[in-house]
Amino acid sequence: MAQENSLLNRPASQTSAHFKIIEIAKSFPETADTLLLDKYLTNEEAASARVFRVYRATPPHYHATCDEYLYVLSGRGTFWMEDPSKIAEFEAGQLLFFKRGTVHALPEILEQPVVFLSVDTPRRDPKDVVFVDPAAGTPETFVQAV
């Protein structure tokens, strides 16, 4: 809990908090066993907010229960949403958005660390990761909470 509170500008209450997003982004380790590591900032019924670092390319997948807004804090890579033939690059300062059920992937990481600030509406259950190819992974191999 001490580390969690050290990443806040002021102590969290039941109704508000002020997070040091860049410090949280820098706190992720250099390597991970899963494709990404995830830090929940808020987890309300209407929405959740997270910071996560992507360590390896992510295979095509979707989220069945939430829309996702991804603000790129650092790094560069490629992504596609809906159509794998329409690959584009992402970089810090960009916002990616997709509705629930939209298949998406990050096929290539061009510059580490790739870190996103995510807002999910409604809240995202950590198990809500559905791989297009079930052999590509499970929620447990996809993400680990820190």
Where are these regions (language model features)?
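A short, N-terminal "cap"/entry segment at the start of jelly-roll beta-barrel domains
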Residues: M1-V51, P59-P60, F131-V146
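Conserved hydrophobic/aromatic beta-strand scaffold that supports enzyme active sites
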Residues: Y40, A49-R53, Y69, I87, ...
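Short histidine-centered beta-strand/loop micro-motifs
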Residues: Y40, F52, P59-A64, M81, ...
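Structural motif
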Residues: S48, R76-T78, V103, P113
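Short, conserved beta-strand element in jelly-roll/cupin
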Residues: R53-Y55, A64-F79, V119-P122
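A generic "binding-loop/recognition-motif" signal
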Residues: R56, T65, T102-V103, Q112
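A short beta-strand-loop-beta hairpin characteristic of the jelly-roll/cupin
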Residues: Y69-A92, V129-F131
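Conserved metal-binding segment of the jelly-roll/cupin
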Residues: F90-I109, V119-T121
